[in-house]
UniProtKB/Swiss-Prot annotation:
Name of this chain's protein: LL-diaminopimelate aminotransferase 1
Pfam family, one: Aminotran_1_2
HAMAP family, per database record: DapL_aminotrans_1 (MF_01642)
Involved pathway(s): Amino-acid biosynthesis; L-lysine biosynthesis via DAP pathway; LL-2,6-diaminopimelate from (S)-tetrahydrodipicolinate (aminotransferase route): step 1/1
Protein's organism: Nostoc sp. (strain PCC 7120 / SAG 25.82 / UTEX 2576)
Gene: dapL1
Catalytic activity: (2S,6S)-2,6-diaminopimelate + 2-oxoglutarate = (S)-2,3,4,5-tetrahydrodipicolinate + L-glutamate + H2O + H(+)
Family under the similarity heading: Belongs to the class-I pyridoxal-phosphate-dependent aminotransferase family. LL-diaminopimelate aminotransferase subfamily.
């Protein structure tokens, strides 16, 4: 009989968001008249920018003409998109990133998991707690951990608590770690990192020959000019960091699928024989073997983000969600709840009232006011007693949800 990858059996019963969906669906079936407002999973609600739609429509027409039809594209992405990303997203901010170091993909979630393909099994891996569950679960699947304890922490991972006491920014570990996951603006807490904070991480990584996985999926929500958008704005980062970005949350591509990963050609790691190997070459080989590239139509849509009209439309879209976050933050604060994030980030991190556990608060919100959020404990043990509220919804729904919550849970 064929055998399985037993590492999957170590995973907790359900990935966080499917478990939320299961509970919501069960409630909806039992209460078909309930008007449920979903502020849980970070999926966008507003239409694609007009510039992106127009570019994609034009690309579809091109695919209908033999002279302009496109078949397989380059696995790394089309040069015209990579050049615009390098110029406008990185070089314009003083970050030294070349177009050849950018790999276009169908999602940063995929890339943060797939990147493990090019790393060995004996690395010491550090994650923040709470953390985006994909970072942990993909390492479990890859066999990089032992079993989970009663708190859900996996043996073999180094957990770096982020709490109100440290402003939800992890402290540099006292021990040596090899791979470090950082996400700023942070999912789920909405925390941001200063240049000084990221410089400390880069210095640590250089001193210990570590690699930082920097998830910048929400960088477009940064409005404070003093905050870095890319880790490559930090001196020395090209020697220690891989950055992941996405078009999902700035241009609404959650259903369209386009993202990018930056692997500097100066970034190296050790082979078993002790030699230094360029990670760019390994990632390029991995993508060329396992990935056929993002569709031409979608990449033309992503390219339109960098047009004058596209930039204005994306800015308006991000501002819309930031205004939602401001409403959530202000209303919940006025109700007496302890609230974090929601500034320079689309997520608001809320302390649950009256000592409720994260899942108990989830159930109460769902059952009493028909509002869905995300239990903090689903992001890790240190998230227990917290709750994530997403700004990704219509203005009408956000205002109605806040009205319901504040009337029910005002302290």
């Amino acid at each position: 009989m064929a055998t399985i990858n037993d590492n999957y059996l170590k995973l907790k019963a359900g990935y966080l968001f499917p478990e939320i969906a299961r509970r919501v669906n069960a409630f909806a079936e039992a209460n078909p008249d309930a008007k449920i407002i979903r502020l849980g999973i970070g999926d966008v609600t507003e239409p694609l920018p007009a510039a992106c739609r127009s570019a994609m429509i034009q690309a579809v027409e091109e695919m209908g003409d033999r002279s302009s039809f496109k078949g397989y594209g380059p696995e790394q992405g089309y040069a015209w998109l990579r050049e615009k990303i390098a110029t406008q997203d990185f070089q314009a901010r003083g970050a030294d990133v070349d177009a050849a170091e950018i790999f276009i993909s169908d999602g940063s979630k995929c890339d943060t998991g797939n990147i493990l393909d090019i790393f060995g099994d004996n690395n010491i891996i550090a994650v923040t707690d709470p953390v985006y569950p994909v970072y942990v679960d993909t390492n479990v699947m890859a066999g990089h951990t032992g079993a989970a304890n009663e708190k859900g922490e996996f043996e073999g991972l180094v957990y770096l608590p982020v709490t109100a006491e440290n402003n939800f920014t992890a402290e540099i570990p006292s021990q040596k770690v090899d791979l470090i996951y950082l996400c700023f603006p942070n999912n789920p807490t909405g925390a941001t990192a200063t240049k000084e904070h990221l410089q400390a991480w880069v210095d640590y990584a250089k001193a210990h020959n570590s690699i930082i996985f920097f998830d910048a999926a929400y960088e477009s929500y940064i409005t404070d000019p003093s905050l870095p958008h890319s880790i490559y704005e930090i001196e020395g980062a090209r020697e220690v960091a891989i950055e992941f970005r996405s078009f999902s949350k700035n241009a609404g591509f959650t259903g369209t699928r386009c993202a990018l990963t930056v692997v500097p050609k100066t970034l190296k790691a050790k082979a078993a024989d002790g030699s230094d190997v360029e990670l760019w070459k390994l990632w390029n080989r991995r993508q060329s073997t396992k990935f056929n590239g993002v569709s031409y139509i979608v990449q033309r849509g992503a390219e339109a983000v960098y047009s004058e009209a596209g930039q204005a439309q994306v800015k308006a879209l991000v501002s819309f969600y930031l205004d939602n976050a401001k409403i959530i933050r202000e209303k919940l604060t006025a109700a007496g709840l302890s609230v974090y994030g929601g500034v320079n980030a689309p997520y608001v991190w809320v302390k649950t009232p009256n000592g409720l556990s994260s899942w108990d608060f989830f159930d109460q919100l769902l059952q009493t006011v028909n509002v869905v959020g995300t239990p903090g404990s689903g992001f890790g043990a240190a998230g227990e007693g917290y709750f994530r509220v997403s700004a990704f919804n219509s203005r009408e729904n956000v205002e109605e949800a806040m009205k319901r919550i504040t009337e029910k849970f005002k302290l």
